[in-house]
């Protein structure tokens, strides 16, 4: 048996829209399979009012569908996951916000949606990875950990536990050990502009990666909050 390591798998942008993490979706099947076969666990980063169309407060059954799975953690991924000036900021919601008051109000609204469905997320990932440094503290004191990108974090120091790592489920030859002893896989549930979605091709690739890691290491699968 090889070195003892941990493996985490995070997935961004799930919300209660068909094709984006709903019961019966093909992508959801590709999450269930590695849990059944290997015991994989997943941290799902969820915007609480995606694109102003899918408030969690109106979709409690969707939240409960995921919370009923003991191998899933639901974490926060912003409020709207969209910007007023999308040409300039894309969907980097908290990079566009440039005032503390607006940031605090947005975080408050974000967490209210979660509260209405009876769940308090302990983890956070910035939509689009980026955040305006001026408003970092508005987010920082609300969560136990933040999931970060080494480049896009741009040297910011958070008081919350900082978890780095973003290797894609579609990758095979550029996988790293992060945070001393953890393989940190990052992906998206859908979106044809992303190359790390849970398609059949990526699922099969990732299954091969997990089989290889299991042959080389003593693996413990974890959600991010379990690190």
Q: What are the residue ranges of the model-derived segments?
A:
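His/Asp/Glu-enriched short active-site or ligand-binding loop at hydrolase and phosphoryl-transfer sites
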Residues: 137-173, 221
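Well-ordered, non-membrane alpha-helical segments in soluble/globular domains
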Residues: 22-31, 56-61, 100-108, 199-212
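Active-site flanking residues adjacent to catalytic metal/cofactor-binding acidic residues
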Residues: 11-12, 76, 148, 185-187
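A short acidic (Asp/Glu
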Residues: 19-21, 54-57, 133-138, 195-197
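Active-site beta->alpha N-cap acidic-glycine motif
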Residues: 1-71, 218
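C-terminal domain-boundary segment and adjacent tail
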Residues: 2, 36-39, 145-150, 189-227
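Metal-dependent polysaccharide deacetylase catalytic core of the NodB/CE4 family, i.e.
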Residues: 40-132, 187-193
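A conserved mid-domain beta-alpha-beta active-site/ligand-binding segment of alpha/beta enzyme cores
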Residues: 156-181, 186-197, 202
């Amino acid at each position: 048996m090889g070195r003892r390591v941990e493996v985490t798998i995070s997935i961004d942008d799930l919300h209660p829209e068909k094709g984006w993490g709903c019961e019966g979706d093909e992508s959801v099947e590709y999450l269930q399979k590695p849990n059944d076969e290997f015991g994989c666990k997943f941290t799902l980063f969820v915007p609480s009012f995606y694109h102003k169309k899918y408030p969690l407060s109106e979709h409690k059954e969707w939240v409960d569908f995921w919370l009923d799975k003991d191998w899933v953690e639901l974490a926060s991924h912003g409020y709207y996951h969209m910007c007023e000036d999308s040409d300039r900021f894309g969907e980097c919601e908290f990079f566009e916000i440039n005032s503390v008051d607006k940031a605090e109000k947005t975080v408050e609204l974000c967490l209210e949606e979660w509260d209405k469905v009876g769940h308090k997320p302990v983890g956070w990932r910035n939509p689009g990875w980026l955040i305006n440094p001026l408003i970092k503290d508005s987010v920082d004191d609300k969560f136990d950990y933040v999931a970060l990108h080494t480049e896009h974090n741009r040297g910011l120091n958070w008081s919350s536990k900082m978890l780095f790592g973003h290797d894609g489920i579609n990758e095979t030859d550029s996988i790293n050990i992060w945070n001393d002893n953890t393989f940190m896989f990052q992906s998206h549930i859908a979106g044809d502009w992303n190359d790390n979605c849970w398609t059949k091709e990526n699922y099969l690739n990732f299954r091969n990666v997990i089989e290889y890691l299991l042959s080389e290491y003593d693996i413990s699968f974890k959600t991010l909050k379990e690190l």
